[in-house]
Amino acid sequence: MDLKAKLREVPDFPKEGINFIDITTVLQDPEALKECIDSMKKKVESFGEFDIIVGAESRGFIFGAPLAYALGKGFVPIRKKGKLPYKTISVEYELEYGTDILEMHIDAIKKGQRVVIVDDLLATGGTTKSNIKLVEQLGGEILGIVYFVELTFLNGREKLKGYNVESIVQY
């Protein structure tokens, strides 16, 4: 199945000049969603033995939790500041206009655990770099990173040099 053909491109969203890649068309199609998860699962399995999957709010949850289930692993959510109920570690990262803070529970990753990060889209790599910092602060080892969509023209892989990065659909 051509998953790229199943995606919808929305011009000038969220602002003029941006060509937004809408994943909801894949999520709504049971066969496309299954193909997407199965394809991501193969990429994750190619990294070798690992312990846990991490996904960032919110679309990382969409792919990370079903992958964790399919692979018999746990799932760790990374959330925006103030959304997790227990003690957290945090990292500030830059957005196009300003900064934001991501958090993870202090007991979410055990020292030495092998971690796979899952997200919907690789653009500049900034959010993923923040995820990596959180995992590594707790002593986790990043085994690999899997995205559904990669915007290659934004060169996000450059920020992630030294990490095993895979994607299903490339623009």
Swiss-Prot record:
InterPro entries: Ade_phspho_trans, PRibTrfase_dom, PRTase-like, UPRTase/APRTase. It is found in: Cytoplasm. It catalyses: AMP + diphosphate = 5-phospho-alpha-D-ribose 1-diphosphate + adenine. It holds the Pfam family Pribosyltran. Keywords: Cytoplasm, Glycosyltransferase, Purine salvage, Transferase. SUPFAM superfamilies: PRTase-like. Its EC number is 2.4.2.7. GO terms for molecular function: adenine binding; adenine phosphoribosyltransferase activity; AMP binding. The keyword Protein transport does not apply. Pathway: Purine metabolism; AMP biosynthesis via salvage pathway; AMP from adenine: step 1/1. Homodimer. HAMAP family: Aden_phosphoribosyltr. Belongs to the purine/pyrimidine phosphoribosyltransferase family. This is Adenine phosphoribosyltransferase.
